[in-house]
Amino acid sequence: MPESRAIVIFTDLDGTLLDHDTYSWEDARPALDRVNLLSIPLIAVSSKTLAELEHINQNAELFDGLIAENGGIVSLKSAMEQHGPSSETIDMVREQIRSAIHVPLRSFRTVEPEIIAAETGLSLDDAIRAGQRHCSDPLIWQPSAQDVRIARTIAEQKGLNLVKGGRFHTICGPSNKGHAMKRMLERLAVFYRDMSGKPVKRFTTIALGDSPNDIPMLAEADFAVQIPTKNRGRKAPLLEHSNLRLAPYPGPAGWNVALNEILDEITNTNKNSEVLHG
């Protein structure tokens, strides 16, 4: 009897599926079309807010599930779960950090949308959505290494984390992209069971990311893809992984090549398995 399994793809956005400067995914279009044709679930995993991800998906219809605020929010089929800390806790820790460091500190939760737009290159409407945060807060600062250490220590003393993404350090809860990936797989397993009437024995997972905050997600995946940082070329691996691939190009161009290669490999290796795409 062939093994019943399902392929699921988890991807970071900024600097990975989306170009770091233009936020375009057009260079990934061939692989995206293939994923859509095969009905493979594609899950966005981002430090962006749920409002941002929902807006992107309303326009592009790329994603089957959304993981927002660095793993603090998991959304599938319009059902949302929050696993991150309260906004009050985030605000308290941020103010403690502000008092302890040696540089000015602002954040997405404390500035006007116009400043978020200037810092990110987003439109004003997109900047408004970027500020609608429930359980995380990207910092706007120019820290020294010592400032980062101080901020991380304060966050950890309160049970929170300070994580480095493609653009910002972000205060967030202990739930990371890897934890959220596991929660999403649990929910997908229920969805497949309800849809097909039989359980999925296992998932084959592919994860793509470019930043330190992607490490927990990459570590959980069967196939992990590290996207090089734009204008910096290839860099040392973010983690040790038995199946880590380094994409040949930054952003969506590298995403496209790496994902197509993995899908080719899975297809050629598992012709005798029953593959559930969606």
Go through the PLM ranges and name each one.
Residues 2-4, 25, 31, 169-278:
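Mg2+-dependent phosphoryl-transfer enzymes with acidic/Ser/Thr/Gly-rich catalytic loops
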Residues 5-22, 218:
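Asp-based phosphoryl-transfer active-site loop
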Residues 9-11, 66-67, 207:
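Residue-level marker for buried hydrophobic side chains located in beta-strands
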Residues 21-110, 229-230:
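Active-site phosphate-binding/coordination module
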Residues 36-37, 156, 219:
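Anion (oxyanion) recognition and catalysis
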Residues 41, 161, 223-224:
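Residue-level detector of anion-binding/catalytic polar loops
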Residues 52-55, 115, 150, 216-217:
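Phosphate- and divalent-cation-binding pockets in alpha/beta enzyme and binding domains
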Residues 100, 104-206, 212:
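Conserved acidic, metal-coordinating active-site core of Asp-based
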